[in-house]
Amino acid sequence: MYSALVRACAVIAFLILSPNCARALQDHAKDNGDIFIINYDSFDGDVDDISTTTSAPREADYVDFDEVNRNCNASFITSMTNVLQFNNTGDLPDDKDKVTSMCYFHCFFEKSGLMTDYKLNTDLVRKYVWPATGDSVEACEAEGKDETNACMRGYAIVKCVFTRALTDARNKPTV
């Protein structure tokens, strides 16, 4: 009789605790071997709550421009003001940091693969900068050819690319 009472209490305790334990387990991410799955009832939208063990596939010619920017800016510290002015006008301000900014843009084009040994990667330039037409690529590669300073020569090519891109953009407005 005593053992039947203990067994009945154990069954009642189990029935009471089971739903609470199951609910607690559902609130934790589960590992299906590849991706952590979250119970969306408890997901608050915070990116930190999501993690994965596999990276997303990338295109063969993918360029991580943020990483390139960090690497080049570590060596050639360039203000965002100079970068934005160059991106909008094709010119750098005449200040004490102009040569450093020239080296930054040369570095950026080299490290991103847009240019290698003063030769433009036509596919990447067309994909990321502007759809170069005619002899634009060859004309830009010829810029600064007599320049002995690597930064100056690279910058001359980059400036040509941006100037032509900006000119094309102004002449062909988008709808």
Swiss-Prot record:
It is found in: Secreted. Residues 1-24 form the signal peptide. Its main location: secreted. SUPFAM superfamilies: Insect pheromone/odorant-binding proteins (SSF47565). Keywords: Disulfide bond, Secreted, Signal. InterPro entries: PBP/GOBP, PBP_GOBP_sf. GO terms for cellular component: extracellular region. The keyword Coiled coil does not apply. One of its GO terms (biological process) is sensory perception of chemical stimulus. Pfam families: PBP_GOBP (PF01395). Transmembrane segments: none annotated. SMART domains: PhBP (SM00708). Disulfide bonds join C103-C151, C140-C160. Present only in a small number of hairs scattered over the surface of the funiculus. One of its GO terms (molecular function) is pheromone binding. This is General odorant-binding protein 84a. The lineage of its organism: Eukaryota, Metazoa, Ecdysozoa, Arthropoda, Hexapoda.
